[in-house]
Amino acid sequence: EDLKGVIVLAATNRIDLIDPALLRSGRFDLLFEVPLPDLKTREKIFGIHTRKKPLSKKINLNKLALKTEGLTGSDIEFICRKAAMLAIRQTIDKNQNLAAEQTAEISISEKHFEEAIQLVLNQNVIKK
């Protein structure tokens, strides 16, 4: 049965990972590549994903963006989530009896971001 009015839309910034058989003529009406985010865009992505997180006052989003050239928006989102989890884990390890009101002590530091960035960079090296 023919599907009428169905549009399939997909986007990627890793077109190099798509099977060439899918990219042959006639498979898609239109192909376009979404480029990797530039420095300014990476900084904005960090801002979006850290907006409601307890960051150390020393965190410089531009500095983080400089260290993440070649990474995707989803990589940066993962870095922010991982850095937050590292900060939580560190706080809990320091104080096993952490009370709910003590969660205000949690602060995501540059060290947490460095560790998260390194994890993503190592994963990207393994993929390639």
Describe each model-derived feature in a short phrase.
Residues 1-128:
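AAA+ P-loop ATPase motor domain of ring mechanoenzymes
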